[in-house]
Regions:
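Conserved PLP-binding active-site segment in aminotransferase class I/II-type PLP enzymes
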Residues: 1-69, 73, 144, 162, ...
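PLP-dependent aminotransferase class I/II
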Residues: 38-42, 50-51, 113, 125-137, ...
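Structural detector of well-ordered beta-strand residues that form the stable sheet scaffold
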Residues: 54, 79, 100, 168-169, ...
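Buried hydrophobic packing segments
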Residues: 62-67, 88, 213, 259
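PLP-dependent aminotransferase-like
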Residues: 68, 72-147, 151-163, 167-179
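Conserved active-site segment immediately N-terminal to the catalytic lysine
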Residues: 170-207, 238-241, 291
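Active-site PLP attachment segment
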Residues: 192-230
């Protein structure tokens, strides 16, 4: 096969996109104003079941601003996963706060048991605030990442947040479309359970605006402050009065014009991802040494990324060797992210219970999962996975 099978490429229906972009360009509103921004915000809000959403420049911009509005201050600590992309952690540092890394469970999300153990054994409560015994710093928030479209255990997490009095920011940048089907939060979408949620529309996400992100919350005052800060904290729209330091984090009308057509196709994209996941699952179950990681059974995931665990002893090669073979076969794949507590800027930061994260880091590959992946291409990937086994 001469062509390359991409890992997670945009699925772009050209006709409606071009129609929207033409309307956007002809209107002259191509920058940070125009009707498509409001239209896209309304569609996202309706889809995930909140009253309002605020479009921003990127998922990172959304996380940065949300942490500020949630009250994270210099000297505070924010609990974060180590198994994630670094963009989920850097915004903590932007505020002069310190990330504390917590390990994962088999969902690849933060382990609620480890989280509880850390809070009970490594922290103390004083004046209704939780402090890290080791550093005497306030635990201001938890930034929880719903990894690869799976869902962290939000029931446990919200119970702990209430008991230990910290804010919960849901990094749902990978999980737009994932929702609970059972339990206390049945029907609730990733990003809508904590104090705030953030989505990303980067090119490899399940829907894209090229870049861009969205902040959601059920707290109107919070969203008003997000909108205010991301538009340069302009107090007077006519006379350019600014009472605070804000950010140029606004979404472009051009981006939103693309997004309004993409969101209409989201459920169709997820249906394709479910079909391809099941195709992989049936085949990989019969390849000794490979395991396709499951998603939680109490959710409808968006199946954003498919994760294969490579058992070197049984498969005959490790995940790095398999990655190289797949790339040589024109199959784009990637290792899981480098653990953040091991990255140079964060090596001196506290990391708690990260052994399982290390285990998965050493064994996981992501295989092609685009929402326009054909059955033929998926079968080619499967064929090569079988062929490469030693």
């Amino acid at each position: 096969m001469a062509k390359t099978i991409g890992l997670s490429i945009p699925n772009l229906d050209v006709e409606p996109i071009v129609q929207n972009l033409r309307e956007c360009i002809e209107s002259g509103w191509v920058s940070t104003g125009g009707k498509f921004i409001g239209d896209f915000e309304e569609k996202i809000a309706k889809y995930v079941g909140v009253k309002e959403a605020v479009g921003v420049q990127s998922g990172t911009a959304g996380l940065h601003t949300a942490l500020r509005v949630l009250g994270v201050e210099p000297g505070d600590e924010v609990l974060v996963p180590t198994l994630t992309f670094i963009a989920a952690v850097n915004p903590v540092t932007y505020h002069g706060a310190t990330p504390v890394f917590i390990g994962c469970d088999d969902t690849l999300c933060i382990d609620p048991n480890l989280l509880e153990k850390f809070l009970r054994e490594e922290c103390t409560i004083k004046d209704e605030k939780t402090y890290n015994k080791k550093t005497n710093s306030r635990i201001a928030a938890l930034a929880i990442v719903h990894v690869f479209g799976n869902m962290a255990n939000m029931e446990r997490i919200m119970e702990l947040a209430r008991e230990f009095n910290f804010k919960v920011l849901e990094d749902a940048t990978e999980a737009l479309g994932t929702y609970y089907t059972e339990g206390r939060y049945a029907g609730k979408y990733a990003g809508t359970i904590g104090d705030a949620g953030v989505y990303s529309f980067n090119a490899n996400k399940i829907i894209t605006t090229g870049g861009g992100g969205m902040v959601v919350s059920n707290n109107q005052e919070f969203l008003d402050e997000i909108r205010f800060l991301t538009t340069q904290a302009k107090t007077d729209q006519l006379y350019f009065i600014h009472d605070e330091i804000g950010y140029n984090y606004r979404m472009l009308n051009l981006q939103a014009a693309l997004g309004t057509s993409q969101i209409d196709q989201l459920e169709s994209f997820i249906s394709t991802k479910i079909k391809n996941y099941n195709l992989y699952k049936e085949a990989i179950e019969n390849i000794d040494g490979l395991t396709l990681l499951p998603f939680n059974t109490d959710i409808r995931p968006n199946y954003w990324f498919y994760s294969v665990v490579v058992d070197e002893e049984k498969y005959g090669m490790n995940k790095d060797e398999l990655l190289k073979k797949l790339v040589e076969a024109n199959i784009q794949t990637r290792p899981i992210w480098g653990l953040i507590h091991e990255q140079k800027p964060y090596q001196k930061h506290q990391a708690y219970g990260v052994e399982k994260a290390v285990w998965y880091h050493d064994r996981v590959l992501n295989i092609p999962c685009s929402s326009n992946l054909t059955e033929e291409d998926a079968k080619y990937v499967i064929e090569k996975l079988k062929e490469f086994k030693r």
